[in-house]
């Protein structure tokens, strides 16, 4: 689409501006390729629309500015002119006179469009130093002033805009800080807070957030200003709560007085701090004024909540202990533990006081939920204390400590918020070892999801039965004969017995969702006693069957499906498995299929490490013994198989010693198999004579006579050779191993020789001498 079509359309009153705005917004090429002449025509015709007295033309011109400033080149070159035209709309439009009523009016559509466009241009300019310095900063004072002036026309939009200016331009906003705070307090305290409580929730929240952001404009120590504001709010809450001393006996609970002493005092008129709310005036002749206590507490806790949640540009010190003490103080004011004073006799006033306390509990739960959502793990050390004072809010009978179902249903929203806080607090924990503190919350949750019969139906049935009984008693007393007539009153009541499901009331969706989420946390985090466990299992099974077979697709809701699977994964003390029932309900679930048809891997073979080590040691010892035996047996076998050779060599060695000649050892491998002998010397004749080796005398024919036959060899224990070595008689196996490579040439001779040099026993010789 060409830019000429757009220029032609906005030349006068546009017939339809929406397609043009859509095209310019989506097709960025149109504005990025625009020529200088076309840009001048576009800007001039847009400004003509903005200056037009016609509301439609003005609205078209304002929204056209919002679209064309998306192109940076247009924003940089024409942003100043466009911003001035928008400010002129804010300045001059309220002076327009309404033609019919002649009143000063302002069109909200033009106002909101103009403010939104200014905010949009500010967001585009902010962060770009040159544009901010040239366009935005010089006009901030005018923008803030106009926003203050039109605050009552569009409070929500203008307050959100002021929050943005506070955050990004605190220095420029500083002169307007006190003025804005005064305006906000007037809005809050208007009509004693009775008017403010009827504002929309989003507008109330915007006022709270704007008030909480004001410390950001402080030049010196803004964090101190923030902390002092929080302390003043807590002190104002403390003073407000003490009003209940006029109705209840605080002396019945000593801990209550201790909590009051821990909190800061209420700001007085002599202090420099400004109170948010004025003093209350309660008149027993106007019981509804009692509810103003709850309204004021709601406002103060709302401001406190905003101080805790709104982001700041500086680090603050959060008085978490004082905040939790304030919550405990509010929840401790309970008519179950505190008696009414003697002058409070009217039941209406008592009911209003109880209702006011319940509203206070709801407000406190809102702050606790915000705290645990924002600060999470920081509240874990305080969870036991919080659970304790929340448990006191559950109504129960003093005799048997049973929970009162009627009061639970009447204040359903309060107990739903309690369960919501419990769910979020349990989600922060991995496991809860002590479950006694949570049992009442479980019972309360199950009461909230029990089937409910319309209370008016049961009341009608009871009243009719009482009337019938009274009529019978009257007739008997008067002696009248009762006529048999049809009981018409029982006809309609018979439907209650036959079609009870038609008289059931629906449980709110938020209640069901909260209870199921709480039960899911309970199942996975703690082990319940059998009573509570079976109650939960019964509820889950009934709800799942009802949900599956009473809908079109026969599907179980996701939240119930998770609950059923967790019930299988975390059985607790359950002795009887509910897996068959749940498998029937969730027949196609793959996780339950693993439980029903397990495919286990091969069982591991457990090995006793101690026995294994002992067996290995025994095997090693046996192998070593076998090696030693083989080494010992081999030379013995060789000696026994060749006794003739040994004896012949002994005789030859004796003859050689007589000549006292040194015999060089040429073939060492034939003499020693395990050692290497480098040098061999002869011994003296006397040592040879003492040698215990028995040698038979040689006959003339020089035949050797052997005493024992060869077939039956005897073991020779000690054979002492006739030769000794001068250097080393027997070298170690290490030397033999080291020189093994040198003796490779003699390996063939060793294999053919069976002789081994016996060990020389020198001790034997010395004894014989």
UniProtKB/Swiss-Prot annotation:
Stretch list, region Disordered: 456-488, 715-769
Region forming the signal peptide: none
Key words of the record: Nucleus, Ribosome biogenesis, rRNA processing
InterPro entries the UniProt entry points to: RIX1_N
Any one annotated GO CC term: nucleus
Presence of the UniProt keyword rRNA processing in the record: yes
Compositional bias (Acidic residues): 742-769
Keyword rRNA processing: yes
Subunit and interaction comment: Component of the RIX1 complex, composed of IPI1, RIX1/IPI2 and IPI3 in a 1:2:2 stoichiometry. The complex interacts (via RIX1) with MDN1 (via its hexameric AAA ATPase ring) and the pre-60S ribosome particles.
Protein name: Pre-rRNA-processing protein RIX1
Gene name, Swiss-Prot/TrEMBL: RIX1
